[in-house]
Structure formats: structure tokens, C-alpha cells
């Protein structure tokens, strides 16, 4: 995901054709070729104050919310967004922006101190998209430390957010057991890093428009139905093939 922005997904009941408005990321017209996907948003303080009830009414079925970055940064809007999404009945997840220059275990503890997960929340997310000038092997080792630390502490297997072009050049293998949230804009289907055979979430636009959110917001798909999403939240199991 872009360092400045959040992520979004919306629920669409049936497949629709790609149009000019869809290309711009309108929520109601974003293409869902198989009609069996959920749409949602992911956000940070860059989206400003959000009317989560309006967003829910516009079809937001889940939201990823920026919580932390590095070893000490907390997104200024995290608390408001975390509470607002829950109050509007939107399944929520928190993400950490990984900084390879900072100790991975310290980053994991910072996230765990900041985010209190409860029943009905999405799994934690690690956003992996920058190198900070660190070597690939060091980045991969640190990412593994963060994922394992957070999974042990929460009992939830984290989601990995990345894009294929970054992951392929930096990370190597051995991460395919973690659910994938992949970023790829302007494509009928996203490119997927070699570690994975399918995606759970797909960020397909960074220029979406959603009621209750001022300006652009990232749009995302979940590769399944509402029942699939609830099963994923409850068990961590993901069996729907996009």
C-alpha cells in the first residue's frame, strides 16, 4: 500500500462491467467478474475524519486501519477509526507498516501494545513494501520474526500485505502459509508472488470514492462471500479460490 494511504474493500452483489467510473474506483461500480467478492476500505489519518455509518451504508463490508509503523509511531487517527468501524458494524483489521531499519521484535511489541483485538476482528496485518536500504536476507528474517511474534501473542495468523514486484526481489520463500493481501492496480487479476497460489485480499485501486470518506481511498476485494469472510475471521481458514 502507499505509505500515505489506507486500503478499501466493498461488497458488490453481482458482477458488473468495467466502465469509466469503475476505472476511477467508484465503490458501487468496481468490477467483480465472478460476483462473489466483498468490497472494503483500508484507511489511515490521511483520509481525515470518517463517517463510518455512511461508509457502511455505501457497501463497505470490512476495513483495514493503520495502527502503527516502525518501533514507536501510532497513526493519529487509529483510535477514532478503530472505534468508528466497530460502532458501524464493519469488521475491522489493524495493520503495521514494517520498517526494516528497526528491530523486528520491537516493532511487533509496539503493535501488540497498541492494538487490542477482540472477537469479530480480522487478523493482524504486516505491510511489507520498503527496504530502508537493508539487505534482502535481513528483511526476510525480520518479517518472519514479526509474524511469528504476533501470531504467538494473539493466536491469530497474520495477513501479509505486499506487491509481487517488491516481494519477488526481496523476500525469498517460506511465507505461503500466511494469507496474502496483494496490491495490483488496473489489472483483471493481480500478479501474485511465487510464495502463494491465490490471494485472500486484493487492493485493486488507490483512487476509490466512498460515502463518508473525503477524497481518494484504496479499494480492495476479499475473494469470497460474507460467510467466507466470517469463517476466515473465526478460524483463519481460507478455502475460497479467487
Identify the function of each model-found stretch.
Residues 155-168:
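Aromatic-lined carbohydrate-recognition surfaces of secreted/lumenal glycan-active proteins
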Residues 93-95, 125, 159-161, 181, ...:
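Structural detector of well-ordered beta-strand residues that form the stable sheet scaffold
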Residues 59, 67, 86-89, 115-119, ...:
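Sec/Tat-exported extracytoplasmic proteins
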Residues 36-53, 65-156:
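Substrate-binding cleft of extracellular glycoside hydrolase catalytic domains
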Residues 23-24:
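N-terminal Sec signal peptide cleavage junction
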Residues 2-13:
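Bacterial N-terminal signal peptides that target proteins for export
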Residues 103-104, 166-176:
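Glycine-rich, charge-decorated loop segments at or immediately adjacent to ligand/cofactor-binding or catalytic sites
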Residues 30-44, 48, 53, 175-242:
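Functionally critical loop-and-helix segments that line ligand-binding/catalytic clefts
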Amino acid at each position: 500500500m502507499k505509505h500515505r494511504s489506507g486500503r478499501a474493500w466493498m461488497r458488490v452483489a453481482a458482477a458488473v462491467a468495467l466502465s469509466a467510473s469503475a476505472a476511477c474506483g467508484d465503490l458501487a461500480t468496481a468490477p467483480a467478474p465472478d460476483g462473489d467478492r466483498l468490497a472494503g476500505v483500508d484507511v489511515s489519518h490521511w483520509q481525515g475524519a470518517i463517517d463510518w455509518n455512511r461508509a457502511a451504508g455505501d457497501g463497505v463490508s470490512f476495513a483495514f486501519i493503520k495502527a502503527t509503523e516502525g518501533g514507536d509511531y501510532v497513526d493519529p487517527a487509529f483510535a477514532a477509526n478503530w472505534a468508528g468501524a466497530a460502532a458501524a458494524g464493519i469488521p475491522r483489521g489493524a495493520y503495521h507498516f514494517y520498517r526494516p531499519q528497526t528491530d523486528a521484535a520491537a516493532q511487533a511489541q509496539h503493535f501488540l501494545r497498541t492494538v487490542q483485538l477482540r472477537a469479530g476482528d480480522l487478523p493482524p496485518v504486516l505491510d511489507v513494501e520498503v527496504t530502508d536500504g537493508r539487505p534482502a536476507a535481513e528483511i526476510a528474517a525480520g518479517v518472519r520474526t514479526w509474524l511469528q511474534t504476533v501470531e504467538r501473542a494473539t493466536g491469530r495468523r497474520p495477513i501479509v500485505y505486499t506487491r509481487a514486484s517488491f516481494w519477488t526481489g526481496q523476500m525469498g520463500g517460506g511465507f505461503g502459509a500466511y494469507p496474502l493481501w496483494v496490491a495490483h492496480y488496473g489489472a483483471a487479476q493481480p500478479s501474485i508472488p511465487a510464495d502463494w497460489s491465490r490471494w485472500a485480499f486484493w487492493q485493486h485501486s488507490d483512487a476509490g470514492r466512498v460515502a463518508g470518506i473525503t477524497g481518494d481511498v484504496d479499494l480492495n476485494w476479499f475473494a469470497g462471500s460474507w460467510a467466507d469472510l466470517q469463517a476466515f475471521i473465526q478460524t483463519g481458514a481460507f478455502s475460497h479460490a479467487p
